[in-house]
C-alpha cells in the first residue's frame, strides 16, 4: 500500500530536519527527505524556508512593516514571493498579514456602521477567523508554515524506526563513502599538480603541448569561457563593460567558492573517535549531552539578532570640571545675594545665571499626518469591490497624494521629521532669519562664542577674533577699544566736593559675626526651624478663631446669612444688639471659612477685621476678671432662677408660642392646596416625559434608516464637491500646459527642420568629397598599372 506523505509536522521531524540541513546543506533535499519517512523533498524545503530558517522574523508586525507591505502589494499585486524578501518576512506571512489587515478594516467599518448584528451566541455574524478556521475533517493546505505538533508519549513503530535511522546516519561522520570522497579529491589534486609540473618542464625544454583533459561533451573551464557571446565586428566603446567586468572580478572570492563546495561536517580526529567508542561509562553520555546543549546555545545565539554595544563619544566636560563650574555658579549667586541690598554694588555685578535661548526646549511635535495604512486598505477594498468598467460611470475615488504611500519608489513615502540643531544652524534664531549680523562677525542674535553671558561687553569682539583675524587686526582692535574707553572716561562729569562719613572699623578682638552669618546653615536645622515656625503660626491662627471652632462644637449645617443678620439688627437693646451682630458675624464667617461636608450657606457676610493678638488676650483677661467677681455670679444665679420659674409656670411648656387656631387652620389648608398642585404638576410632567420617550423610540424606528442614508449622502456630496474642485484645478492646469506645449511645438519643429537640413547638406558635401577622392584613387591606380605593364 503506497504511503501518502505530508501532513502536520511534529517536533521530532523538525529536529531531524535541522540536523540534516546542518549536515547536508540547503541543496541536497532528496538526502534530507530520506531521513523523514513521511515527508517529500519539496515539503522539507518548504518547511525550512517557511518556518525553521533562523533568518525568519516571527515577532509582531510593526507599523513600518505594515505600511511597506501595503505599498508593495499596491505596486506588485499577488507577487508575494517578490514582496517577501523586501519586507523581510516569508511569502506566507505576508499573505496572512495582508488578509488580516483587510479583515480588521472590514470589521472596523461594520462596527462603525452598526452592521454587526446581535452580539454573542449563535446569532452573531461569523468573523474572518471563523471563516478561515479549519472544520472537522478538513486538511491544512499549508502545514509547513504552522507550529509543530507536540510529540506523543507513545511513538508509532515507523516513527521509532525513522528516529533511530536518523540518529545512526547523522552520527556517522567517518563512513566509507566520506573516506572515499576525500581520497578521490586528494588524488585529483595530485594528478592536476603532476600534469602542471610536466607541462612546465616541457615548456622550459622548448616543447609546447596542449593539455586536453576534458572528455567528449565536457568543457575545460580553465581554457574556455562558458556562455561566451562574441561581440559583433566593429568599433564600439567598451569603457563601461570593462569597468563592470572589473567590479565583478573584484567581488569574486575563490575562497568562498571553495568553502561552498565543501561539506559542512568536518572530520574529527581518529583519536577522539576511538576514545568515544571505547568509553562505556556514563561520563561520555553526560559530556555528549553537555556538548549538545552548548551547541544548541550557540545556534540560538546565532539565530538571534546580534546587538552591538553602544559606542558613545567621550564627554567633553569631565566630572571634576562640572563640579568646578557648579561651585563657580554658586559663588556668583552668593555674591549677588550679598550685594543685592546695596545700590552701588548692584550696578557693578552682572547676572551670570543661565539664559534660556530662543529655541524651544522640548522637541517639536510632529505635524498631524494621515493614517497611510488605513488609506491604503481603503484603496485596496475600493478597487476590489468596484464594479466592471464595462458598466461605465465614474472612477473609484482613491486616497492619493500625501494621504497615501505614493508610487515614488519601492519604499513608501513618508515625511521626515528632523529635530532642529542649533549648533548646525547658529544663524537661525528667534529674532528672524537672515538678519543683519552684529558688529564683530557674530551671527544675528547669537551669543559670543566663549562668553555666553557678557552683560558688560568685556569680551564683545572675542567671537570675531577666533576666526580669520591676524595679529595686526588684534592690535588695531585693542587700540580702538582703549581709545573708546578714554573718550567715555573723558565724557564723565567733573567730581563734586562731598563729605563722607565712614564707620569705625571693628576691632580685631571682636567676634567674627560676619563670618558666622555668611556660613551656611545645615539643611536639617533649617527644615526643623521652618517646621516649628509653621506650627507656631498654625497655633496662633487657631487661637484667633472662635471657641466653637477651637473646641469642635456642633455648628448649623444650613444657614441663611441675610436672615441671621436681619434678626440680629432687630434687637432694640444697643448692648445686646451689638453682641447679637457680632455673634451673627462670627457664625457667618465660621460657616463660610470652615464649611461642613454637607452644609449649605446662603448669602455673603462682610469680612472680619483682623485684630491684634495683644488686644484679644486683653479682652479675654477682662472677661475672666469680670466673671470671677462674686456679685456678678449672684446676679446670674438670681436671673437664672427667675427665668426657670417663669418658664415652668404654665401647664405645657412653650404653649405661649401658639397663636390663633383659625389662622393656623387657614395656613394648613393653603399648604395642602399647594402640595396637591405640586403633585398634579409632577404627575403631568412624568406622563409627558414617558409619552415623549415612546414617540422618540417610534420615530427612531421608522426614520433611523433615512437618517443614516441622509448622513451617507451628505458625506458623498461633500466628497463629490471636493472631487469637482480638484478636477477643475486639474483642467485649468492641463489647459495651461496645452497652450504652452502648442507654442513650443512650432519652435521645436523649426529647430529640428534646421538640424535635418544641416545634416543633409553635410552629407551631400561628404558624398561629393568621397566621389572626388574615389576618382583620384582610380586614376592613380590606373596610372600605376599602366607603368607596370609598360615595364613588362
UniProtKB/Swiss-Prot annotation:
GO terms for molecular function: DNA binding. Keywords: Coiled coil, Cytoplasm, DNA-binding, mRNA processing, mRNA splicing, Nucleus, Repeat, Spliceosome. Residues 1-56, 57-106 form the HTH myb-type domain. It is found in: Cytoplasm; Nucleus. Residues 29-52, 80-102 bind DNA. Residues 507-517 have a biased composition (Low complexity). Associated with the spliceosome. This is Pre-mRNA-splicing factor cef1.
